[in-house]
Each structure stands twice: as structure tokens, then as C-alpha cells.
């Protein structure tokens, strides 16, 4: 039996599920009567999406469909950071959607402080873009997971728990 147990708190999403949601979004935009002639283009890069269309209203409709498709693919809506809609040339508008992945130093510090203040039997250490919680007892780790889940709404980021051992 190991002398200590641990798990990692991370903020990630399944890239393939996002690609699938974007493909579904493109198909629906091509088929919907109100969006068919809007010249809407959705491009996906490593850490952002760009939506280009004729009007703000069309972009808002595409945004709603994106959120709906992401929900159906079990993606957290907290991964999307919608930027301001910008006007670009040719009577077109564009919106950049940044994709949140990984824990920032600030959020890692807040989570670490939360765990240290409320749980005396576990330790938290920041490891790059994740946070490792270690304790001698599995029950203490379960309590730490429950504590973090209760406070998750304070952090505007999707949290997952991995490597529970």
C-alpha cells in the first residue's frame, strides 16, 4: 500500500470533441435557411476560433449554435472566451473565441490557498499548468475534491481531476 496518494487538478478539453462540434456547427450553418447566404466561415486554430460573417446578428446565432453543439459533445462552456466583435473589410464582421486550456499561475495559487486553508492533512503543489494534491489518506483527497467542486463557480475555468492514485 502506498504511503501517500495524490491527484492532479487540470483544466483541459478534448480537442477532437471540439473539432467534431465545429464540424456539426459548419454543417448546420450551411443548411439553415437564415444562415445559408451569410458567408459565414468558422476557422479553428490551436488555441482559438474565428467566426467571420456578414452581421453581428449572424455571429450571435452562430455563437448560440456553437454553445449548443459543445454542450451536446460534453464540452464545458467555460472553455470559450468570446472576444469583442470587430468590423473587418468587405462589410464583414469577425469574432475571435479564445480557448481556455491549462491552469494559470493565479488560479493555481487560489486553488492551492483554498486547499491549504481548509484541509490540513493534504498538500498542494503547483506543477506547470496543473495542481497536484497529495495526502496520506484517500478520504482526505475525496474531501479535497468535494471542496474544489463546491468552489468551482468562483473560478471561471473548467476543472477536471486526473491521475488519482
From Swiss-Prot:
CDD domains linked: YajQ_like (cd11740)
Stored Pfam families: DUF520
Cellular component, GO annotation: cytosol
Keyword RNA-binding applies: no
Domain of life: Bacteria
Gene3D superfamilies: 3.30.70.860, YajQ-like, domain 2 (3.30.70.990)
Sorted UniProt keywords: Nucleotide-binding
UniProt GO molecular function: nucleotide binding
Keyword Nucleotide-binding among record annotations: yes
Cited function: Nucleotide-binding protein.
Protein family: Belongs to the YajQ family.
Protein name: Nucleotide-binding protein PMN2A_1813
Native source species: Prochlorococcus marinus (strain NATL2A)
Amino acid at each position: 500500500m502506498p504511503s501517500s496518494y495524490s491527484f492532479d487538478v487540470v483544466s483541459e478539453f478534448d480537442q477532437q470533441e471540439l473539432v467534431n462540434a465545429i464540424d456539426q456547427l459548419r454543417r448546420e450553418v450551411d443548411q439553415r435557411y437564415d444562415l445559408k447566404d451569410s458567408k459565414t466561415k468558422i476557422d479553428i486554430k490551436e488555441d482559438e476560433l474565428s467566426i467571420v460573417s456578414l452581421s453581428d446578428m449572424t455571429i450571435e446565432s452562430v455563437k448560440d449554435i456553437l454553445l449548443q453543439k459543445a454542450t451536446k459533445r460534453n464540452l464545458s462552456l467555460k472553455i470559450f472566451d468570446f472576444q469583442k466583435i470587430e468590423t473587418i473589410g468587405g462589410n464583414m464582421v469577425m469574432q475571435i473565441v479564445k480557448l481556455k486550456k491549462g491552469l494559470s499561475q493565479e488560479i493555481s495559487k487560489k486553488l492551492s490557498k483554498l486547499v491549504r486553508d481548509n484541509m490540513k492533512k493534504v498538500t498542494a503543489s503547483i506543477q506547470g499548468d496543473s495542481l497536484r494534491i497529495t495526502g496520506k489518506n484517500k478520504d482526505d483527497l475525496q474531501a479535497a475534491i468535494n471542496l474544489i467542486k463546491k468552489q468551482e463557480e468562483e473560478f471561471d475555468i473548467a476543472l477536471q481531476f486526473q491521475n488519482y492514485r
